[in-house]
Amino acid sequence: ATQTSFAEGLKKEREYFMQCLESPQSAGLRHAFFAEREVSKVPGIDKETPVRDCSSAAVIGAGTMGAGIAYSCLSAGLKVKLLDNSDEGLERGRKIVEGLFAGGVKRGKISESEMEQGLSRFATTQDYTDLADVDIVIEAVFESMAVKKEVFGALDKVVKAGAILATNTSTLSIDEIAASTSRPGDVIGLHFFSPAHIMRLLEIVKGAETRDDVIATSLALAKSLGKIGVVVGNCFGFVGNRMLYSYGRESQLLLLEGAAPEYVDKTLYDWGMAMGPNAVGDLAGLDVGYKIRQERTDLPDDPRFYRVADMLAGMGRFGQKTGKGTYLYEDGSREPTPDPEVDALIRAEADKLGVARRDISEDEIIERCIYGLIVEGAKILEEGIAIRSSDIDVVWMNGYGFPRHRGGPMHYADSIGLDKVYETVCGLKDRFGPLYWDSPKLLQDLAKSGGRFADVGD
C-alpha cells in the first residue's frame, strides 16, 4: 500500500483488512472476546441475588498453591490468615508471599507502601480457632478426599455461620466434601490454576446444595481477584481436568505407539498450544496425576492408560522438581532435554504390552489429541456440567493454553463443521475401537441436524 497512490493504498489496505476479518483466526478471537463476557451469565444468578461480605479470608495449606492464593487475596485488599500444620510450612508460605510482594515492587507493579499495606493484612497460624471470624475459607491441601474431609470437619466446628467454605480441589467431588460438614449449602469449589497469582481462570464448582448467594459471592470474588470465574457442575475433574484426561490419554498412547515425547510436544506447540502435554506433566509434577489415579476406582480397563506417566512417577521421576521426568532438566534448568533412557523405557513397555510401534504423522497427533478434547467436551455439555459450550472454551483458553485464535475446542469443532467432526470420530472408532471413541449422542444429533455446539442451551 505504501508503494502506490494514497487512493490505491487505501483500496489495498481494505482488501487485506477484509481478508483478516473473514479469517478463522479473526472469528476465533472474536468468539474468545464475547465468550469471556458471557460466562458471568449464570441461570438463577442475577443482580438481585444477594452477595455475602467477603473482606477476610483464610487459606488452608501453605504450599506454593496456598501461598499464591493468599497473595492474590491480599492483593485484592482482603485480610488473610494462612494456616498450616507445621512451623516449617508456615515459614515457607510466608517467604513465598513476601517474595511475591517484593517481586511486584521490583517490577514496578506496586509501591513499597502497597507492599507494606498488603503484608500488614497477613497473618499465619496453626490453630483453627483463629479462623472463627473469617468470611471465606479456601482449602488448598493435598489432593486426598480423606485429608480434605478432615479439614472441612475441623472448619465446620469453628468457622462462623454464613462463612463460605471453599475447596481448591482439582478433581474431587464437591458433594462428598460438603457432606463432611453440617452446612453443605455454604460449600463450593474454587479451583485456582497454578501459579495462582498469575493464571486468570477460576473454576467455580457448584455442589448439589450450594446456595445461590454463595455462587454469586464467588463470582464477585473472582472479579475482585482479576480472574475469569466460570461456573461449572460437579463431576470428576469438573470441566478442565476431565477434558485434560482425554487429551493426555491420547498423548500417552502416542508415546507407546511410536511418537517421541518431544515430537508430540513440538507438534501440538506448533499447532498453537502454549506447551506440549509432556512438558506440562513435568511442570505440574507426574506424581500429582499418579496419586489421583491411584485413588480412582473408575479408570478404564486398559493397561496402556497413562502407562508411561505412571511408570515414570513410580520411578521417582516427577518432572522439573526432581530434575527428571519425561525429560531431563540438567543443573536445575527448566529447559527440557530428551532422555534416551526414557525412550528405551517406553520401547520396552510397548513391547511388554504388545503395542506395535510405527511412524506417526503430525496430523494424527493433532487429530487424536484435539478430537479427544472435543468428544469429552461434548459429553460435558450433554450432561449439563457446563452451562454453554463457550464456557468450556473459556476454561481451556485461560487455564490450559488452548490457542486463543482457534477460539477454544468447542468453537474449533463448530468451525470445522460437526458433520465432519462426527465423521472423523467415527473413523477413529473404527481404527482404535469404541473404548475412547464412542460419539456422544449430542454430537451425533448436531451432526445430523447441521447444528453447532454454540446453539446448545440457547
Question: Where do the model's predicted regions map?
Answer:
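N-terminal glycine-rich phosphate-binding loop for ADP-containing cofactors
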Residues: A1-D458
